[in-house]
Amino acid sequence: KGPALLWSGDYALAASGIGALGQEALDELTNGRQIQLNFAVEEDAFEWSAETRPADLADQLRLFATKLAQPGWDPAPVERLKLGLLTGFDQQETTPNGLIDRDLIGWLRGDDPRWRSPTREEIAALTPASFRAFWEPLLKSGPIEVQIFGDLGTVDIDALLASTLGSLTPTAAPGDDAPRQIGFPAANSAPRIVRHRGDACQAAALLAWPTGGGAGAMRTGRQLEVLAAIFNDRLFDRLRAQDGASYGPIVASEWPQGVDSGGYLLVGSLLAPKDIDRFYATARDIVRELATTPVTADELARNAGPVREQYARALTGNLFWMYLLEGATRDPRLVRAALFIERDIAEVTPADIQRLAQQYLTSERQWSLVILPEDRGPR
């Protein structure tokens, strides 16, 4: 209800203070200590996070608890956010990359107001009062999940939790009318056209398909990552081989953990306007090949190996485990999915890759978008 101001939280909510203490006062209190207050909007939750150390953990938890119990509403961070967004708004429209950085997630989620970037008018309409009216009830709603990873041998974690987050007044469950689905743009036979106001030699092309999401099918999400790696490898080689085009295409798969929708496989590249048709033709050739001809064992191993190694490195760190287990107290399937990541990737077969290409990368589900300079007419 009312304006969707999720975009305003990442910076201004953490910086708006606690009670009567603004950010400067908090900085003075935590000077020389490893205490943080970071905020993020996830697919199905709001997240406060920090990297700290055992000696500072007690006060770190007190900071979280006090922020939830007595949030501050210093207007200065809201005004700084507003000024910064308005100042950079026009600059972002001078390059294809600027528009992608700002608008890609909104495009891929069907311009859902929860995810799309704000318009200039929406930014200009932001006030400290509207910011507080939007965020204050949200901070008071929903259950709180706590995750702590690290060396806790010298810490009485049960006592710390009981005296901080555990002492908060129970919060009301969120209303059931909140949309739990994440959308995707309607398929199109011709690319959507977006204009930038920069160099006439710069453009970008995007191609995407919806996939899925959810903890119950994380194995499919891992398999799609391997498919994306194979697609990326082929696309990179072919674009470089064609007239020496020096582009850096990217193919990425996204599979949300907390909701059963919103996943996608995205293919994109910055390029010259004259090369857009060639890019799409090459990408569609690869799609057709993946769906009709199984990849070789060598190609599969060459691309699955780096994906598995990347996970193996990430799994040695606390932050990655926190990411993997977000929501696990509500959905224990996430624990099992986290424990079997490397096995899921190692067991991907050529038949899996072909099946996924046939299932997801179809023309009936395909969405595309091009970013062209303003002086280029419709294609």
Model-derived segments and their meaning:
Residues K1-A14, I18-Q70, R80-D90, T94-I123, ...:
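M16 family metallopeptidases and their MPP-like homologs
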